[in-house]
Structure formats: structure tokens, C-alpha cells
């Protein structure tokens, strides 16, 4: 016996589908509707049930059971049979044949009409039967259970009615009804404020929590407080600073046992490099900051990310200008300093002289009663290197350097470049958390996904913990050295924040105050009531520098003072321009020229450079510019007089004075004073000036006009109206 559906079985046994489904449920057989399939065993059980029920009626009328259902007459078949008979029994008589043909035609039309009516009736009966079968099944479907209410919901800012309904697991119409009962007319897409959300949720007994929205675009200012239990010890980040050619890179080369110096042009470090070494099973991260004075800003950045500064001073050379700069940067960053006295292998080495010179900068050796660690070493021979590394680890332990590796990574860009094969490449120093390959990241004003990570030895790594320098690829643009980076939960969020930061930077650049120049000093430098002109002086010899500084400081103009922020011997360099950029200063060159880099940066940063060969020309130019900075002096200039000959009072306008211009002219934008019998009654501005019915800008001598004075109506015949302007006068 084959499978059959519920409705087929019901039709076969002449019973409703509802009855069959009911019987199946009594037999503990689950079916959903009349289209459900019945297995042969189930059909046998149903047959057994229905046979028992119908035993008596079958015995009394056995013939009825065998009777086939009455089929509708097939008029088409009958017609075919008749047609055959007509063909077989042809009659030679023409008249009788014609009559038969006409009758056949008439019968055919009747049969077609009856057949059409029959099919229409059949369709109606089938449709009604189907509807009857489906109706009870639909009624028996179980009702939807309401979802359980959540104990607590969270939201940011606002929620629409649809969003709130989704969070509560209710229909939006139900929420709209509740709001209506509370007196709030709302639609499905209407936003609800915090009060409305709390009212609805309290009605359902659900707790509400509002998430505080943090502006993640400014992630540098976000301070994440870690649990002390999550903090682990991290390697110290050490910056090696010092004067050019004092042996910084050679020292690092000795520590790493690699030839870094040979790869660099001229033996001078071109970029900040980051390297990691292992000492006594502990790691130390080194940043090699360029020592040349042209890289002032790079050195300042190096001090910001470092934990310990190793100040390299040559034993045979002593303290130099760049040494002092390095000390100032380290102190500004509040970073402990370890002094490494290098080149001890040289015959003219004098470490005591170096110690004596450094005492002037408050770096006193421990052996002389101070707290600064001094290490005597030779980077060339390797003498004293181990002692220096031990001192670095000792200071690191004292500083208790710790970080949480189990959170999203943050840190700083050490350097960045555009590689022809790999695209934007950035060297990052991870300062907190762990950076993984595949992390969505925002770096400065760009974003991307960490595609690959390479450590300082050139090996690919999958993750980098705190104080680890790595080179990454996968950014959309090249970031700036010194930019901060942060990892986000997904690339979509990283892209949004990166684009928002780029847009913000663009707006800041547009609104950035223009650099000061001697041509527009009056417009550019105003800080409250205090006027100040910042100047950087560069000259060919020290005598010229001193003479120029003294002459500039003697310039006396009321309310303005000269501030020399930097004065030195030598050509105008890139670092001078960068200093002028940050301090909004003018650069004056005396018998010197700017180098190519300085010119390029000055053009891009709009820094004003003035070059002179004669000192008094410098003084004259600066003095003239400073005088222009002062608030201008004004004097009054009378431009005309008019006599009031008649007055008219108009409601909502006031008193109109009919005047005759006796001298000069009266202008629409001039100020006026009303004089009555030689006494000034009122000073103010003209509200309107007309000739006849037309507004005019001015009325010349000998013409009549009508005018009103702003906020004044006490005008009488015979009054004199004097027009004047305030004219700027050059300060002497």
C-alpha cells in the first residue's frame, strides 16, 4: 500500500478532512494539516477504525458500496458515436439526409452549451469543498506565544518606536497604544527620548540603562584605566640621544651585534629605528634618535615614547649644543637619564671634564653625591656595554614599567614611508595591549587592517605585545611619524573613525590661523591687549648675532615688544622653520641663506623669511611693521552741514527733518550731531536719507533732502545737522 495525503484518504472514505485529523490525534499521531502525508501503517489503522464504524450500514446495503459514483455524461463521446452511426447508415434519399444534418448541427450547439455550464458548476463545487477542508485546519493552528520580556535593555541616545518594540519583543502597535495612553502621539519611525523610553519600560517592568557615547575619533584623549591585576611587566623603551658623531649608532651597533652604521648614508642616522635586544632573559627596546640638529622635532617625538634616555657624550669632546637640546627634551618629558661617556679608548679622553660640564645642567653623578647614573664605555671596543645594559634594567625595575597585554592595542608611529612594492609601511611601537595580524586599525588620520607584521630582525610575526616595535602593511595612506594608533573591533568602525579624523584635520587646516609676516603684522598678531613679535635670528658670525639681537631689543614702540626666541650662527635650516611654525615667528637671516629643505618647508608652512645684509635696514623694516601692529589713531573730519527748515511727524517713523544742505555734503553712512543754538543736543547716525521719495547715498550742497536720525525725534526748525566721519591717521 502506497502513501497518501489526509485529504485523499478523507475523499476516499467520504468523510471530512477535519474528522480524519481528529482521529489521528486520538491515535497520538501528529499531523499539521490536510496536506500531511500518511504512512501505509497509519492508513491501515485508519481503515480498521472506519471499517468498525461502518460495519452495519455495509451489511444492510452491500450493493450501494459497490455502486460507482455517477459520472457526468460525456457529451463529446456520445456525439462521436452518433456521428459514426450516421456515417455507417447512409440513406440515398437527399431530403431525409439534409434533415438529419440540420438536427445534428442543432444538437451539437446544445451539447456544447450544456458542457460549458457543467464545467462552471464543477469548478464552483470544487472551490467550496476545498475552502471547507482548509477552514477547520486554520482554526486549529496554535496561537503565537508572546516573547518573554528582557530583564534589562540598553540604548544610546534615542530609540525609534520600532527599535524599542524589537528590544522588548513586542509589536510596534502595542508600544504606540501605550504611548497614546500616556498622551504621546507617535508613529513607528518616531524617535523617543530617554523619558519616554523609561516610562514604557517601567510599565513593562524592564530596567533601562543608557550607554554613555564616547567620541572615539579623539582616541588620544581617551584614558583606559586597567585593573592592577591585569598589568604585567613590560620591556623598557630606551632612546639613545646625543651630539652628532658622539657614537650613538655605534653604541647601538655594539649592543645589537649588527652593522647598522654601514647601511646609513654618511654614518648619520636618517630615521628613527626601533630594535629589541635580550639581556639576562629580559628584553630592552631601543629607539635610535637622529642626533643632527635638523631633526629637532624627531628627537622630541622620541622622548615622548621613551621610558629611559641614554645620553651619549664623547669623553674627548664634552658637552655640545645638541647634547644640551637632548637634556632639555628628556627633562621636558620627565624621563630618567643615564649618561654614557663614550670613546673611553681614546688617549685624550677626559670623563671628569664631561661630568663637570653636565653638573651645570643638574646631572650630578652618584659618586659625587647626585642621583644620575654615569657609565664609562667604549662602543668601539665593547668595554662597559654590559654595565650599561644592567643599569638600564635596574632603572626599569625602579620605574616599575607595566602594561596590560590583554586589550586592544594602542601606541605610536615611529616612522612611516611609501614602499613601491608594499604600499604604505609604518613602524609602530605598541605601548599597551597586543597587536595581531588582521586587526582593524586607525593610525593618525588613516585606517586599514594589519596585513603583515615584521619585527626588527625582518621576521614575520603574528602578534606584538607592549613595548614591541613592528613594521606593518595594510594602511590606506602613509601616516605621519609621531601619530597615535588604536585597534578597533571591526573594519567598518575603523573606517568611519579614520575618515572622521581626516575630515576634522582638513577643517582644522582650513581654519588654521595664517602665519605672521611683516606685511600683515597688524592683522596677524593680537593676543588680548598684549602685542608680541617673535623673531628667530640667524647670522654668519656670532658678533653679528649679538649686534642684531641687541638692536632689535632696543626697538621701542608703545604696546609692542620684541621677543627673540632663537638666535644662532649658521644657515637657516629646516629646524629653524619648524620652530617658527610652532611659535608663529618671523625668521631674519643676516648674511646667510636658507637651505633647500628650509625653503621647501617655509613655502608649505607659510613662514616669512627676511634676508638682509645691512643691520639698520633690518631695524627699519621691523620697526615699521611693529608700528603697524598698534591700534590705529582716528580723527574727526566734518564733511557737511544742513539746516532744518521744516519737520514732519509720521507714525511708526518718527520725526522727519526737511533740510537744506548749506555746506559740503551729507552721506548716508556718516555720523551726525544735532546743534541747537550752538549747543550739541545729540550725536548719532542717520537712519534714512531721501530726496523726494527716493533713497539716496549722499546729498550735495545746494540741494534739499529729508532725513531721520536713529533713535532721536526731538528735531526742531532752525536746528543745524553736522555730518562727520572718523578718519584713520598714520601713527607717528
Swiss-Prot record:
One of its GO terms (molecular function) is translation initiation factor activity. The keyword GTP-binding applies. Residues 242-249 are annotated as: G1. Residues 342-345 are annotated as: G4. Residues 288-291 are annotated as: G3. It comes from the Bacteria. Disulfide bonds: none annotated. Residues 233-402 form the tr-type G domain. Residues 40-147 are annotated as: Disordered. The keyword Cytoplasm applies. Residues 267-271 are annotated as: G2. Residues 90-103, 118-129 have a biased composition (Basic residues). InterPro entries: EF-G-like_DII, EFTu-like_2, IF2_II, IF2_N, P-loop_NTPase, Small_GTP-bd, T_Tr_GTP-bd_dom, TF_IF2_bacterial-like. GTP binds at residues 242-249, 288-292, 342-345. Residues 378-380 are annotated as: G5. Gene3D superfamilies: 1.10.10.2480, P-loop containing nucleotide triphosphate hydrolases, Translation factors, Translation initiation factor IF- 2, domain 3. PANTHER family: TR-TYPE G DOMAIN-CONTAINING PROTEIN, TRANSLATION INITIATION FACTOR IF-2-RELATED. Belongs to the TRAFAC class translation factor GTPase superfamily. Classic translation factor GTPase family. IF-2 subfamily. This is Translation initiation factor IF-2. It comes from Geobacillus sp. (strain WCH70).
